[in-house]
């Protein structure tokens, strides 16, 4: 049945939220009945797809937690990358993923203000971004109750970036956050990524492992977001470079 329980209440709520008078009808015959049936089927198919995607996302999150030996559920992953050209217009980017996939409303960009941006020091840039992000969290939510604390931090980089991040967190008194760096192998080949934990030996995943593809997508999204923010900043400063036309530069 396509009938709605308490249609008067639903009409009232919809009218209030849209500022238009909404009238619910339930046609049994004719063109309107066909439209309602088609809409119902489309909604069911969309819900089935969404449930399937959510189930797959949950499987990937669990697989990533297992790969990193993390016991807690990964409800929020933050991925960081920085973008600049020789230190100019340096930007840090943070993207977020969770059980429902990428959470674009939670993305953040950081205009790198310190001397790091002037010298092109990638490690100092990462330290500044991490310090600003988590100093703010410590002020806004010291009890970690609002769901904005990450269950996992992923850094686009190797041992240097991971060490810089871990040391910055330690200076803030944060020693319990899960952290991993992801860097391409010596040949810079996708599929041969190495995973870096603080003061541990790097390891890799099978190139066919779905978890590896998942991490690659997260890293690529962070890279895309950081480069986009960097180019927007360059454009705003009225300085564009031929390098901006080269995919992946930044």
PLM regions: where:
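Acidic, glycine-enriched active-site microenvironments
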Residues: 1-250
């Amino acid at each position: 049945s396509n009938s709605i329980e308490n249609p008067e209440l639903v009409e009232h709520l919809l009218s209030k939220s849209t500022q238009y008078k909404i009238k619910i009808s339930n046609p049994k015959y004719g063109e309107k009945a066909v439209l309602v049936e088609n809409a119902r089927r489309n909604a069911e198919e969309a819900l089935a797809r969404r449930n399937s995607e959510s189930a797959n996302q949950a499987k990937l999150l669990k697989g990533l937690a297992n790969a990193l030996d993390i016991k807690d559920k990964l409800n929020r992953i933050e991925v960081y990358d920085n973008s600049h050209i020789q230190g100019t217009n340096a930007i840090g980017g943070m993207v977020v993923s969770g059980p429902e996939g990428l959470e674009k409303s939670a993305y953040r960009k950081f205009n790198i203000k310190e001397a790091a941006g002037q010298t092109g020091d990638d490690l100092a840039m990462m330290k500044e971004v991490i310090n600003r992000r988590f100093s703010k969290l410590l002020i806004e939510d010291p009890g970690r109750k609002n769901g904005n604390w990450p269950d996992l931090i992923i850094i686009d980089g190797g041992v240097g970036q991971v060490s810089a991040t871990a040391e910055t967190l330690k200076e803030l008194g944060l020693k319990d956050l899960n952290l991993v760096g992801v860097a391409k192998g010596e040949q810079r080949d996708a599929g041969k990524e190495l995973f870096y934990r603080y003061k541990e030996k790097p390891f890799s995943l099978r190139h066919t492992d779905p978890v590896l593809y998942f991490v690659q997508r997260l890293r690529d999204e962070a890279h895309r977001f950081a480069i986009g923010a960097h180019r927007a900043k360059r454009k705003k400063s009225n300085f564009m470079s031929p390098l901006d036309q080269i995919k992946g530069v930044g």
